[in-house]
């Protein structure tokens, strides 16, 4: 084949594809995004007002090139002191944590911290509705586990072992995903927690 006009032979190059790096910090973001979309749905339909709490940030270093242009150059996320979400539904205070795992048989208890367990106990003491949404991404299953069930399990060994999915299925409630809202947890609160079916 003639490569007119310069008679050059084109070199073919093979580009190596880089292995995709797994970002473990954001692995729960799709579940979190589904919860946020659910909360937006509840808000827009005037069913509930529930928001994600901002993660506390510790500012370490600020650069002041000009007095009016302060720039944060170093900051770190602090460990959250309470739960992920809070709000109000029909006059009831709602407070919950959301966790996701790829495991098929258990939810790692190392995902829960002592101060979160203490916070949940305090919410229950004040008659608030407190729970955790547990998502098993490999199984595509989500459960609402009342906080008192989480606290009972946590007290066995202060959160050193994993919570078996059988315990979650027995003591929690399956959340059937839908299009709108994606994670309809208010249905369970209404039917099971406020409806008197749960002690």
Curated annotation (Swiss-Prot):
It is found in: Cytoplasm. The keyword Nucleotidyltransferase does not apply. Keywords: Cytoplasm, DNA damage, DNA recombination, DNA repair, Endonuclease, Hydrolase, Magnesium, Metal-binding, Nuclease. It catalyses: Endonucleolytic cleavage at a junction such as a reciprocal single-stranded crossover between two homologous DNA duplexes (Holliday junction). Binds 1 Mg(2+) ion per subunit. InterPro entries: Resolv_RecU (IPR004612), Restrct_endonuc-II-like (IPR011335), tRNA_endonuc-like_dom_sf (IPR011856). It comes from the Bacteria. It holds the Pfam family RecU. The record marks 99 as: Transition state stabilizer. Mg(2+) binds at residues 82, 84, 97, 116. Disulfide bonds: none annotated. GO terms for cellular component: cytoplasm. It is an enzyme of class 3 (hydrolase). Gene3D superfamilies: 3.40.1350.10. Its EC number is 3.1.21.10. The keyword Hydrolase applies. One of its GO terms (molecular function) is endonuclease activity. Its cofactor is Mg(2+). One of its GO terms (biological process) is chromosome segregation. SUPFAM superfamilies: Restriction endonuclease-like (SSF52980). Endonuclease that resolves Holliday junction intermediates in genetic recombination. Cleaves mobile four-strand junctions by introducing symmetrical nicks in paired strands. Promotes annealing of linear ssDNA with homologous dsDNA. Required for DNA repair, homologous recombination and chromosome segregation. NCBIfam families: PRK02234.1-1, PRK02234.1-5, recU. Belongs to the RecU family. This is Holliday junction resolvase RecU. It comes from Streptococcus agalactiae serotype V (strain ATCC BAA-611 / 2603 V/R).
